[in-house]
Amino acid sequence: MEQRESEQRFSSRLAFLMSALGIAVGTGNIWRFPRIAATNGGDEGAGAFLVAWVIFLFLWSIPLIIAEYIMGRKSRKGTVGAFVSLAGRKFAWMGGFVGLVTTAITFYYSVVVGWCIYYFIQMLSQPLPATTEASWSLWNNYQASALPLFFHGIAMAVGAVAIWRGVSSIEKVNKVLIPTLLAIVVLSVIRALTLPGAWNGVAYLFTPQWSQLSNPKLWLEALTQNAWDTGAGWGLFLTYAIYIRRRYGIVKNAFVTAIGNNIVSLLAALMVFGTVFSILGMEGKTSGEILDVMKESGPAATGLTFIWMPQLFAKMPMGKMVAILFFLGLSFAGFSSLISMMELSSRNLIDFGLKRKTAIACVAGVSYIMGIPSARNLDLFGNQDFVWGVALMISGVFVAMAVMRYGVTALREKEVLQNKDDWDLSTWWDKNIKFVVPILGVTLLIWWLSLSATVYAPDDWYNPMSPYSVMTCFVQWGAVLAVLWWLNSWMADRIQSQTD
């Protein structure tokens, strides 16, 4: 007999932890973090960036993850219901915005997972591309075909199956994905570090050039990486927290999840830095030339992953095996995050009164259709990634505002301090949620919009049709907010009618 939604719970702490790590560990750990670390490194090393990155883990990511866990467990509702429960009826639109931002990311994230699946199959069945031209040919031929649509559909279908039975199927999938992913990452790191010259890359990664800390851009990039990397403020942890038992400590799991995520990012960086420095170093390239390769954004910011890594694997002993493991791990990382995004969207529909299977079918169908433009056009993909990636800063601030609306201290005392199974949580969390998170979120938002106006689209920042303009953000956010404000009372009524 199928368990009622209100009664579903994770079967164990381990099952919950694996699922929470599945949220945090995604493709960004493996392809974005090494590139951003290299981009923000100085002539001597990238260690200063790592320092700033760790600081923001404790100032942004962990406080927001704790807030999400509290909201989800207390309300037993998705993002809309949680905001209604904690902040009040008038703030249903805020929960809707948090949910829709992550749903919009789902549309094109599924396309990314499709890329990873395709490359895994290619690495498994075809010779590795040995030159830059061959690597570009592999990428361009794929993008020019109908295959991106096919693999986008495969990703959505697998994601739908993974959440079909609710938390019971989610935890079963993550119990396989996450340990396998961690094993793949560790094996890949070991192989990379045994290559000649690999430790030059490791030395660069961890050597601090302290003067870099005076560069505001480094701090903003470190904060952005935390905001995008851990999943804090997306509403994903809130959604999984619906299914946790009270004895599962919120604080301890928030720390383990966030720190575990950053460890995976560091392992991925060790693998990438070690491989790139070894192979290109043996070809006689200087450190500066090697770093130029690592900083290359490429198509849809994936140049290092899909253009350079395959040809580097082709030049190393046992490279085919490592390439297969690399793209299998990338696929697993993508899937573990994708299913949490699909569960968030489905859970909101369930809270509005839909049956789970109907909600999942709606989410999968709409997500596939809405992802088609990103699958067919990389400019549209880049636009959606920019617009909704920046909107995550607003989502993080909204989560903090919901907690403040209820009462930060009251929530900490009721939901954490009265739980003997959890770690203690001092007033640093209160201060972070009230002051630090809003300030950081607004600062990031202003910075990214200023980059749009001065760097990405300086000549047409006012043009809503320009992929990276300020106006394209305002128009798309404004359209979503207008609809949500119009539907606010209806959403609140539906949530409360289902609760009653």
Region locations from a protein language model:
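Inter-helical loop and helix-membrane interface segments of multi-pass membrane transporters/permeases
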Residues: 4-7, 35-44, 79-97, 110-167, ...
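Membrane-embedded translocation segments of transport machinery
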Residues: 2-14, 171-339, 347-354, 358-362, ...
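Membrane-water interface regions at transmembrane-helix termini and the short interhelical loops
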Residues: 36, 40-43, 86, 90-106, ...
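Membrane-interface "cap" regions at the ends of multi-pass membrane proteins
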Residues: 1-31, 64-69, 73, 77-83, ...
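Transmembrane helix-loop boundary segments of multi-pass membrane transporters
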Residues: 32-54, 70-72, 76, 86-87, ...
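C-terminal membrane-solvent junction of multi-pass transporters and transport-like membrane proteins
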Residues: 88, 94, 99, 144-145, ...
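Hydrophobic alpha-helical segments and their helix-loop junctions in multi-pass secondary transporters
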Residues: 64, 106-131, 182-208, 274-279, ...
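Transmembrane helix-boundary motif of multi-pass solute transporters/channels
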Residues: 12-54, 238, 244, 253-255, ...
